[in-house]
Design a protein with these regions (language model features):
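A short, N-terminal "cap"/entry segment at the start of jelly-roll beta-barrel domains
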Residues: 8-46, 123-134
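A cytosolic small-molecule/anion-sensing beta-strand core signal
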Residues: 41, 69-70, 85-86, 104
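Glycine- and acidic-residue-biased ligand/ion/polar-headgroup-sensing regions
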Residues: 52, 61-73, 78-79
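Conserved short histidine dyad/triad with adjacent acidic residue
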Residues: 44-60
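Ligand-binding loop in jelly-roll beta-barrel domains
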Residues: 94-123
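Short acidic-glycine-tyrosine-enriched beta hairpin
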Residues: 79-94
Protein backbone atom coordinates (compact mmCIF):
# COMPACT_ATOMS: atom_id res chain seq x y z
CA UNK A 1 0.00 0.00 0.00
CA UNK A 2 1.35 3.40 -0.98
CA UNK A 3 0.76 6.21 1.51
CA UNK A 4 0.33 9.83 0.47
CA UNK A 5 2.65 12.29 2.22
CA UNK A 6 -0.07 13.37 4.70
CA UNK A 7 -0.83 9.76 5.69
CA UNK A 8 2.87 9.00 6.00
CA UNK A 9 3.36 12.01 8.27
CA UNK A 10 0.47 10.86 10.49
CA UNK A 11 1.84 7.33 10.66
CA UNK A 12 5.30 8.60 11.58
CA UNK A 13 3.90 10.91 14.27
CA UNK A 14 2.29 7.95 16.04
CA UNK A 15 5.52 6.00 16.29
CA UNK A 16 7.21 6.19 19.71
CA UNK A 17 4.55 8.63 20.95
CA UNK A 18 1.68 7.88 23.33
CA UNK A 19 -1.81 7.87 21.83
CA UNK A 20 -4.64 8.86 24.17
CA UNK A 21 -7.83 6.95 23.33
CA UNK A 22 -10.09 9.37 25.20
CA UNK A 23 -8.69 12.34 23.27
CA UNK A 24 -9.02 10.49 19.95
CA UNK A 25 -12.62 9.41 20.67
CA UNK A 26 -13.50 13.06 21.43
CA UNK A 27 -12.64 14.00 17.82
CA UNK A 28 -15.66 12.27 16.24
CA UNK A 29 -19.29 11.45 16.99
CA UNK A 30 -20.43 9.22 14.12
CA UNK A 31 -21.15 5.54 14.64
CA UNK A 32 -19.83 2.64 12.56
CA UNK A 33 -17.13 4.77 10.94
CA UNK A 34 -13.64 3.49 11.85
CA UNK A 35 -10.92 6.09 12.41
CA UNK A 36 -7.27 5.07 12.00
CA UNK A 37 -5.00 6.11 14.88
CA UNK A 38 -1.82 4.12 14.12
CA UNK A 39 -0.17 1.65 11.76
CA UNK A 40 2.23 -1.20 12.41
CA UNK A 41 3.58 -3.65 9.84
CA UNK A 42 0.73 -3.01 7.38
CA UNK A 43 -1.86 -3.34 10.16
CA UNK A 44 -4.05 -0.46 11.28
CA UNK A 45 -5.40 0.34 14.72
CA UNK A 46 -8.88 1.85 14.32
CA UNK A 47 -11.20 3.42 16.88
CA UNK A 48 -14.93 3.07 16.31
CA UNK A 49 -18.03 4.22 18.17
CA UNK A 50 -20.82 1.73 17.68
CA UNK A 51 -24.50 1.84 18.55
CA UNK A 52 -27.42 -0.16 17.20
CA UNK A 53 -27.00 -2.93 14.67
CA UNK A 54 -24.45 -3.42 11.92
CA UNK A 55 -24.87 -5.72 8.93
CA UNK A 56 -23.94 -9.38 8.77
CA UNK A 57 -20.68 -9.62 6.85
CA UNK A 58 -17.34 -11.38 6.67
CA UNK A 59 -13.77 -10.68 5.64
CA UNK A 60 -12.60 -13.40 3.26
CA UNK A 61 -8.89 -12.62 3.48
CA UNK A 62 -8.21 -11.64 7.09
CA UNK A 63 -8.99 -12.15 10.75
CA UNK A 64 -10.37 -9.15 12.65
CA UNK A 65 -9.72 -8.14 16.26
CA UNK A 66 -12.40 -6.37 18.35
CA UNK A 67 -11.23 -4.78 21.63
CA UNK A 68 -13.83 -3.07 23.83
CA UNK A 69 -12.44 0.12 25.34
CA UNK A 70 -15.65 1.38 26.97
CA UNK A 71 -19.16 -0.09 27.21
CA UNK A 72 -20.33 -3.47 25.96
CA UNK A 73 -21.26 -5.04 22.66
CA UNK A 74 -22.40 -8.32 21.20
CA UNK A 75 -21.36 -10.18 18.09
CA UNK A 76 -23.78 -12.59 16.46
CA UNK A 77 -22.21 -15.50 14.61
CA UNK A 78 -24.11 -18.13 12.64
CA UNK A 79 -24.21 -20.51 15.62
CA UNK A 80 -23.88 -18.28 18.70
CA UNK A 81 -23.82 -14.78 20.20
CA UNK A 82 -20.96 -13.52 22.35
CA UNK A 83 -20.86 -10.49 24.63
CA UNK A 84 -17.77 -8.35 25.11
CA UNK A 85 -17.36 -5.88 27.95
CA UNK A 86 -14.81 -3.16 28.63
CA UNK A 87 -11.34 -4.68 28.73
CA UNK A 88 -12.26 -7.75 26.66
CA UNK A 89 -11.44 -8.75 23.09
CA UNK A 90 -12.14 -11.39 20.48
CA UNK A 91 -10.49 -12.47 17.26
CA UNK A 92 -13.01 -13.17 14.49
CA UNK A 93 -11.60 -15.72 12.06
CA UNK A 94 -11.33 -14.82 8.40
CA UNK A 95 -14.38 -15.83 6.40
CA UNK A 96 -16.62 -16.12 9.48
CA UNK A 97 -19.93 -14.29 9.13
CA UNK A 98 -20.58 -11.95 12.03
CA UNK A 99 -22.85 -9.07 12.99
CA UNK A 100 -21.69 -6.68 15.72
CA UNK A 101 -24.22 -4.63 17.66
CA UNK A 102 -24.55 -2.57 20.82
CA UNK A 103 -27.66 -1.43 22.65
CA UNK A 104 -25.86 1.65 24.00
CA UNK A 105 -22.87 3.46 22.57
CA UNK A 106 -19.74 1.34 22.84
CA UNK A 107 -16.18 2.42 22.06
CA UNK A 108 -13.99 -0.20 20.45
CA UNK A 109 -10.67 -0.68 18.74
CA UNK A 110 -10.27 -2.79 15.62
CA UNK A 111 -6.93 -4.21 14.55
CA UNK A 112 -6.82 -5.35 10.94
CA UNK A 113 -4.69 -5.06 7.81
CA UNK A 114 -4.66 -1.67 6.10
CA UNK A 115 -7.30 -1.43 3.40
CA UNK A 116 -9.90 -3.69 5.03
CA UNK A 117 -13.42 -2.39 4.36
CA UNK A 118 -15.68 -2.39 7.43
CA UNK A 119 -18.55 -4.16 5.63
CA UNK A 120 -16.34 -6.82 4.03
CA UNK A 121 -17.82 -7.86 0.70
CA UNK A 122 -21.38 -7.01 1.77
CA UNK A 123 -21.18 -3.30 0.91
CA UNK A 124 -24.17 -1.06 1.62
CA UNK A 125 -24.96 2.22 3.34
CA UNK A 126 -22.74 1.50 6.35
CA UNK A 127 -19.57 1.11 4.27
CA UNK A 128 -17.06 3.64 5.60
CA UNK A 129 -13.78 4.95 4.16
CA UNK A 130 -11.01 2.47 4.98
CA UNK A 131 -8.24 4.98 5.66
CA UNK A 132 -9.81 7.85 7.64
CA UNK A 133 -7.11 9.11 10.05
CA UNK A 134 -7.68 11.18 13.18
Amino acid sequence: MLLCSEQLQRALLTMNNPINFKEKFSKFADHWSPKVIAEMNDYQFKLVKIKGEFITHNHEDTDEVFIVIEGSMKIQFEDRVIELKSGEMVVVKKGEKHRPYAENECKIMLIEPAGVVNTGGAGGDLTAPDNDWI
